[in-house]
Amino acid sequence: MLDCPRLALLCALPWLLRAAVPGHRAEPLKRSAELPRNPRDPARGADFDRVYSGVVSLSTENIYSFNHTSHPGQVTAVRVHVNSSSDNLDYPVLVVVRQQKQVLSWQVPLPFQGLYQRSYNYQEVSRTLCPSKATNETGPLEQLIFVDVASMAPHGAHYKLLVTKIKHFQLRTNVAFYFTASPSQPQYFLYKFPEDVDSVIIKVVSEKAYPCSVVSVQNIMCPVYDLDHDVEFNGVYQSMTKQAAITLQKDFPDEQFFVVFVIKPEDYACGGSFSIQENENQTWNLQRSKNLKVTIVPSVKGSVYVKSSLFSVFVFLSFYLGCLLVVFVHHMRFQRKPVDGSFGSGDGSGNMAVSHPITASTPEGSNYGAIDESSSSPGRQMSSSDGGQPCHSDTDSSVEESDFDTMPDIESDKNVIRTKMFLYLSDLSRKDRRIVSKKYKIYFWNIITIAVFYALPVMQLVITYQTVVNVTGNQDICYYNFLCAHPLGVLSAFNNILSNLGHVLLGFLFLLIVLRRDLLHRRALEAKDIFAMEYGIPKHFGLFYAMGIALMMEGVLSACYHVCPNYSNFQFDTSFMYMIAGLCMLKLYQTRHPDINASAYSAYASFAVVITLTVLGVVFGKNDVWFWIIFSAIHVLASLALSTQIYYMGRFKIDVSDTDLGIFRRAAMVFYTDCIQQCSRPLYMDRMVLLIVGNLVNWSFALFGLIYRPRDFASYMLGIFICNLLLYLAFYIIMKLRSSEKVLPLPVFCIVATAVVWAAALYFFFQNLSSWEGTPAESREKNRECVLLGFFDDHDIWHFLSATALFFSFLVLLTLDDDLDVVRRDQIPVF
């Protein structure tokens, strides 16, 4: 064991060796050791708000001491500014700030890493020191702050030092505060919740979009992460161009937090362009400063949540009351009518004079392929005069029965019946009612299966998204309207979810209405009611049930989408929008063509193809011309193929098994017969007009997409569906009026309500409060304040109105042909 003199000599050996180095001066270290004994030394008596200049090198280090006092109830902070004229990254000026509980250090020039290994170096750096809080128990808190300035430069590096006290460090409620920040001069401030405030919204505004910035909210802890590379390590944060907003609950320790503002060295995170850097070590000082305004305002109280929730429920429950009132009025009117003949006298007296049950005999001389009908039937008269066969006199005794083809399958051959010039509903409702009803029930059961398998993974995914947002604090994951996003529990925007309640409630109400009609129709069939069996549009409710389920699922999936709306889950609710539009078109077609509608399997397979194309369009449709060429070709060809099937009532077939060019001869013959030989007037004029207009609309969509290539491909595809649906509905109503059919008051009311509500809904839809097509910061530029009850924004109103408009649209389809319930099916034209 070493004795004491030898141990003391060994401990002093490093200092002796340092003193023996030629040219080395130990004076700064000596001054540091003598600071308490030399009152004239600047390391002891440094003052706030005074600029200190100096040179540091390998042999010189300067230490400044500042005395800072904190008083109870007052939170003050200190800010250190360091500037260096040197741009040598190999020998930067090193700054170390020592406080009572922490150490903060940085270098000047301060480097920032950008994309693709770009480097941005700043010669002027300002940092705010973590404040110390004095309590009433301890009284004023006095502490020393040491600022060490050093460098390893062999020839010295110049610097300037300024230490100031921040006068306005604590933000106040409803008071705007203006300041400036840059990448090397971040800012943060303190906010403490007032006693009567449970939640607040931090609103940050800037007049210019760039430079890109980040707003962060962090717990009161040191160090504060206020640089670009570490601001995402703690708290809640979001990128910003012109505005940002963060809603916070009163669940922070000591009910206070830091609001941190960081300017990014590059703008790519906010959608900006790259900066061209000529010199690898180029320094940046004032080029990326940004003026900001921050205002912290109280958010809505809990009573607003309750009031808004009750408002949403009662608004849509009023529809239930309205439907009950309509049912009661109809019931009372039905009870007042006499039993005998009452059904026809009130709603269809104009047709009852000639309407009677279909007989089993066929009038002599009826046209080839005609249905069984009485001599007074307009359908028979039109078929006999325009059917294309020569007209024979019914009284011509020279006509032998053997002159006619009496094959028994003539009256059931689809190729004969569906190619007649004038078709009536009885021609296309010849199949067994039970079989057809089961066929349409498949739509209902299939959509339930699709909904379950579709919704469960969606719910799991959005819950994962919300969990990631809550755990990481990264609010750039979801594209909310942050100026009107009211959290509840783990949900960040409860108001966007609540506003979808209307789809579910109105969808369920529509199912109840359809169920009532279905039960009444079944009772009529069980009672052998002649009007239920042979009059009016055949009642098949499978598609209506499917539409009701689709409306409910639209609400569920829209709510799931709004849990965390972003680029990855937009198709959650748009998928059922496509299905709703498609089901409505199928229902319109099925009304007058009950026997030849598409099967549920092919219909849902078509929807799957549409959704697949939509996803591909969102991924590839922004810049790839080849996708638009392929999609436009598919769109045009699909329109032509569907038009052909509709024009020929599904009876157009080409024998592809003929290998000696028979397919082309068949196509040429059809073209010659229907387009050239009869060019003066198509065989089916009404259908031809509809299909020409429909093809022009679809070709216009295809041409528009090919030329302009819209970025929002999902909305573009939805526009195609909606325009086709509106076109078909308008054609249906026009043809109905042209056929001298009536539109009862209830469907007239539904049509008017549908038009008015859809117009209002589309106004709010196009407000564009956010958009996942750009960056999160660009999306926040479109954010706006709440407009209804201080709780709902424009998009929430779109949810309310669109649910109502869809409900009325469904009622239009359900009630439009109620006037035909007293008209024989062989008198109802097909169009």
UniProtKB/Swiss-Prot annotation:
Disulfide bonds: none annotated. Keywords: Glycoprotein, Membrane, RNA-binding, Signal, Transmembrane, Transmembrane helix. It comes from the Eukaryota. Residues 330-441, 515-540, 590-599, 647-687, 736-745, 817-831 are cytoplasmic. Residues 20-308, 463-493, 562-571, 621-625, 709-714, 767-795 are extracellular. GO terms for molecular function: cholesterol binding; double-stranded RNA binding; RNA transmembrane transporter activity. The keyword Membrane applies. Residues 354-408 are annotated as: Disordered. Glycans are attached at residues 67, 83, 136, 281, 470, 566, 768. It holds the Pfam family SID-1_RNA_chan. The chain crosses the membrane at residues 309-329, 442-462, 494-514, 541-561, 572-589, 600-620, 626-646, 688-708, 715-735, 746-766, 796-816. Its main location: membrane. It is found in: Membrane. GO terms for cellular component: lysosome; plasma membrane. Residues 1-19 form the signal peptide. Residues 397-408 have a biased composition (Acidic residues). It is a multi-pass membrane protein. One of its GO terms (biological process) is RNA transport. InterPro entries: SID1_TM_fam. The keyword Transmembrane applies. Belongs to the SID1 family. PANTHER family: SID1 TRANSMEMBRANE FAMILY MEMBER 1, SID1 TRANSMEMBRANE FAMILY MEMEBER. This is SID1 transmembrane family member 1. It comes from Rattus norvegicus (Rat).
